[in-house]
């Protein structure tokens, strides 16, 4: 069923939520990348573009079904409801792990440079890397607020003791070997970019420039960013727990002293 490291089966895993405007455009780019890599002899023709419909309310799933009928390289799965970006990525990875040699997860909006996949595959084939992180070399397309909050977020995570790759989101290559180890994680609050380094296999990074969104609007508002940040901090670091525990001990100690003081005052007053 599987190919070899020299001719691996690649599954490109793409989470989709209400992407009817951008999907008809980027789907062609993903297919072209697959066919180009096959033509160059870098991957097997059994490679696929795997779309994960995350409970979309628009025509996203209908478009995915039409794509699957149009070309064998397109396949899709659909979640029964919207479970969030991280869960959608994980669902795609788990769907692919027994069918491929490597996966590359990437968003549907076209902001991540698809051409970086060539270097990712090369790092797997030639250098034996099991994980390859896509790292943004520039964030010129982001607003000042987003750049500032992103930088602060990474600094906070590192200060909390979490191991994360700076300027890396969810654009990465993972081998099937890594995916099978990753399947053993039972984390409820998913923060994939922090969980992947914990697996511990040989890794490297590939730099790329981030583009403007090709079409449609972002489905990742500030509220979701804050929620992801909270999940990252609470799931990867014990420092918040230690802080809360220490604070609780101090409060309990002060309360105990207060009670003793009140008893003494009452006895002296009597």
PLM region spans:
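Acceptor/aglycone-binding surface of glycosyltransferases and processive sugar-polymer synthases
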Residues: 79-81, 85-95, 102-105, 114-192, ...
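Hydrophobic helical membrane-anchoring modules
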Residues: 1-9, 193-270
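Structured catalytic core of nucleotide-sugar glycosyltransferases
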Residues: 1-142
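Structural signal for short hydrophobic segments within the conserved structured cores
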Residues: 75-77, 165, 204
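A generic fold-level signal
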Residues: 5-7, 44, 166, 174, ...
């Amino acid at each position: 069923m599987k190919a070899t490291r020299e001719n691996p089966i690649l599954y490109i895993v793409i989470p989709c939520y209400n992407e009817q405007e951008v999907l008809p455009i980027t789907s062609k780019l993903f297919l072209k990348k697959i066919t180009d890599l096959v033509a160059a002899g870098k991957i097997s023709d059994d490679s696929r573009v795997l779309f994960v419909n995350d409970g979309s309310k628009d025509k996203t799933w209908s478009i995915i079904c039409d794509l699957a009928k149009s070309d064998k390289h397109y396949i899709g799965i659909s979640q029964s409801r919207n479970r969030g970006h991280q869960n959608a990525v994980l669902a795609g990875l788990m769907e692919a792990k027994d069918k491929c040699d490597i996966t590359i997860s990437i968003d549907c909006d076209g902001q991540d440079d698809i051409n970086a996949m060539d270097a990712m595959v090369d790092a797997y084939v030639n250098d034996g890397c099991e994980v390859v992180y896509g790292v943004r070399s520039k964030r010129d397309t982001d607003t000042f607020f987003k750049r500032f909050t992103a930088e602060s977020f990474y600094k906070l995570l590192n200060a909390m003791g979490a191991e994360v790759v700076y300027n890396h989101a969810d654009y990465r290559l993972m081998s099937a070997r890594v995916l099978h180890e990753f399947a053993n994680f039972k984390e409820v609050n998913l923060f994939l970019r922090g969980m992947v380094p914990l697996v511990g296999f040989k890794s490297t990074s590939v730099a790329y420039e981030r583009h403007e969104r090709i079409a449609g609007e972002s489905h990742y508002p500030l509220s979701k960013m804050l929620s992801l940040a909270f999940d990252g901090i609470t799931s990867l670091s014990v420092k918040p727990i230690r802080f809360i525990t220490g604070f609780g001990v101090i409060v309990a100690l002060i309360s105990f002293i207060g009670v003793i003081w009140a008893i003494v005052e009452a006895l002296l007053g009597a």
